């Protein structure tokens, strides 16, 4: 039902600061007026003005003396742990899954604009699986289904379910919901009981002076409020999730094709250390611009490369590792109690400024497409809550096995579809080598079915078998394991 928009003067009176957004109000159709009025009434313009002011008043810049690596007692490297310890962590994580205590939250609000698509990034075809679930969300749904099956097979283990919470944005919610519904039906998930879909807020964009911008004569320029928008967006759902028995959250970005959703090792590690917050990281590479997980004035924080500076960023330890080498990959563990605390209205995160090129309608009604940054979008960062942690830990994993994001168009050549396909194939080959299968296939990538193996298990039947192009095409005892 369309809401009838009130007169222009009434809107200005009710929503201070909205007057410049109504310059062309009298030229709009009734439907366009209603749409603009709805947008103005939901963007919280009065608070947005204050957010812009506050975003310029951030903490004092950190100095080299302020920044220290996270203590060794809080930083564990998975590859350095004995298999017996890893098995124990896996079992502890699987126990939590079996009891239905784990919720996986995927941050899926982004569109695949850089990839040349208007679809949500989590739904675009990957060119890997021709049958079903050929998307990032499809791979992740299959991993959840497999973990649930593995939990159900364990002796004395309840067949627990992993709750899947999907954070979208206003521009991606409808398409993402339909995609996830199909995945849920395919894997036997109860969509209403096991899946929560919720949308992060949008915030108006600004020019450099803090004025709001029109994208068209009848719409305000607005954008999702960053991955830190998770906390305000999910807060209303926490009581229901707690009532379901959820105690632990695994939060991850949709674009990482190698993400181990609800990773039992990671969850078991965090539970064993009584962590309220834990984060996965990978060793940083030379010149890499990802943030570093470190201590800033004694509190855990992710510090951007630009803030570290080249000298600190390149500093090494006696054993040749980067001193600030814990590269953040936006992959986190939180307890329910911690989420309750940081999602309360009194724990609002700060906004950070991002200078962007923003197309807008000028006072003459002409659309302006700038060639350089001309405006500001505000974002909240998911990791800004780290400093509120009472027991913070890092879980360092192998980049080649757990981190390959899909961010760029194919023409860029890095973090693009072909590198994701390559890295997924390489992980699958690594698993096959560990069971001493002989991989001789060379014509195409090797993709194990996601539902077959989560972490290289269930592949003993392929021990000493030759994985060749012909075997993948015609030998059912082999090709039943693979996407062919």
UniProtKB/Swiss-Prot annotation:
Its main location: cytoplasm. Pathway: Nucleotide-sugar biosynthesis; UDP-N-acetyl-alpha-D-glucosamine biosynthesis; UDP-N-acetyl-alpha-D-glucosamine from N-acetyl-alpha-D-glucosamine 1-phosphate: step 1/1. Substrate binds at residues 227, 407. It is found in: Cytoplasm. It is an enzyme of class 2 (transferase). It catalyses: N-acetyl-alpha-D-glucosamine 1-phosphate + UTP + H(+) = UDP-N-acetyl-alpha-D-glucosamine + diphosphate. UTP binds at residues 107-110, 121, 200, 226, 255, 377. One of its GO terms (molecular function) is uridylyltransferase activity. Pfam families: UDPGP. It comes from the Eukaryota. Keywords: Cytoplasm, Nucleotidyltransferase, Transferase. Its EC number is 2.7.7.23. One of its GO terms (cellular component) is cytoplasm. This is Probable UDP-N-acetylglucosamine pyrophosphorylase. PANTHER family: LD24639P, UDP- GLUCOSE PYROPHOSPHORYLASE. A motif (Substrate binding) lies at residues 107-110, 304-305.
